[in-house]
Design a protein with these regions (language model features):
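Conserved anion-binding
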Residues: 10-24, 90, 97-172
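Short, acidic/polar
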Residues: 28-40, 85-90, 144-155, 207
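Catalytic cores of alpha/beta
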Residues: 73, 77-99, 182-217
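Glycine-rich phosphate-binding active-site loops on the catalytic face of alpha/beta enzymes
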Residues: 91-112, 168-171, 199-203, 213-233
Length: 240
């Protein structure tokens, strides 16, 4: 089981929102670098860096902070938010991202997304499958499509896609528990996929249950920031 720390950034601070709603935005840390160092000391190997301003507000990508985080830590960074062109994807990698997660691009321009897969490699590109009421949402979860998530995965799976990040938006940042049945359904249909799951984690028991159903990559965030998962619990779990 690979535990991935969720680090949402707005105005160079660590924040979290519930189900993508900016009205619920809550600040947690003034210094992203100090937080990353803390995760590194605990044994976390990967972070999911969400550039929230770029994703939802069309602000300039915070590549300066991305570069700083990559220089001050050995943690691998999966960067997401506002990467709507191949040039921005390239800039993310140049500035220290180990992976990038793309959600809007595969919907708006399949050919550019497929070109990203072949240019940077299938291991470095993750497709976001962000679900609200059984359909995809894109553009920082602001635009509801009529696209069926499984049809979306089908198309790119047939093109060689290896990595997906699946989020039930209604669960994200809520501490309401993960959508276990959704994950089981996708695991069963796409056993070859490397699936990253995120949203709803309440405690260590949720993480253990996800492992039991076959999930290998779990993003956690609010449960740690709100101390539902303690430092000792996280450190002990990472040592297993």
């Amino acid at each position: 089981m690979n535990l991935i720390a969720s680090v949402y950034i707005k105005d160079n601070k660590v924040v979290k929102v519930k189900s993508g709603d900016f009205r619920t935005l809550k600040f947690y840390h003034e210094s992203p670098i100090d937080l990353i160092k803390r995760f590194e000391d605990l044994g976390v190997k990967d972070i999911y860096f969400v550039d929230l301003g770029s994703a939802k507000m069309y602000e300039k990508n915070n590549f300066i902070l991305l570069e700083m985080l990559s220089q001050f830590s050995s943690i691998k960074i999966n960067y997401s938010g506002g990467l709507r062109t191949s040039e921005k994807v390239s800039s993310a990698f140049i500035n220290g991202a180990d992976k990038v997660t793309l959600g809007s691009m595969p919907v708006y321009d399949k050919n550019i997304f497929l070109n990203c897969l072949t240019t940077w490699g299938f291991k470095k590109i993750v497709m976001a499958v962000d679900i609200w009421k059984n359909s995809l949402r894109i553009n920082g979860w602001k635009h509801q499509t009529k696209i069926d998530p499984l049809d979306h995965i089908d198309y790119f799976s047939n093109k060689g896609l290896k990595n997906i990040k699946v989020t039930d938006i209604s669960k994200d940042g809520t501490l309401d528990g993960p959508p276990f049945s959704l994950y089981k359904k996708i695991l069963k249909k796409y056993p070859q996929m490397n699936m990253i799951t995120g949203g709803g984690i309440r405690n260590i028991k949720d993480i253990e249950k996800l492992k039991d159903i076959g999930i290998k990559n779990v993003i956690f965030g609010r449960a740690f920031y709100e101390e539902n998962i303690t430092l000792n619990e996280l450190e002990n779990y990472l040592k297993k």
